Amino acid sequence: MKKIAFLFLLFFSLNSFSQTQLETDEEAYNNYYKADRELNIIYQQILKEYKSDAEFIKNLKTAQKIWITFRDAEMLAKFPKREPGYYGSIQPTCWSNYLQELTEERTKRLKIWLTGIEEGNMCSGSVNIK
């Protein structure tokens, strides 16, 4: 009897934590969306902080456009166009997760223009010194 009660509780506790594929896809997309919003906030802060450096701003905008092109190409390299169903029902989740990963990597790189580089770094380039 104890085994039956245990299995019954185990089944319902596991079932309560499960998600549908649609919920998993939605959660992954929302995580990507948050990462993308953060990237855009950081990008706008950089534009504001460095607004007096026209050459840097021009180059940053060019770099960001190229990064978007790279990101899109990277997505297609990881998930080439295939017949429907090739990647299975998990594909939207995988797509969003990889977009999130690429976006967070870009945000990390951009943040350096806001956090600055330690004084004494001879290769700071356009990045402000702390």
Identify what each model region corresponds to:
Residues 17-130:
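N-terminal alpha-helical modules
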Residues 3-18:
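Sec-dependent N-terminal signal peptides
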Residues 1-2, 105:
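Short, intrinsically disordered low-complexity segments
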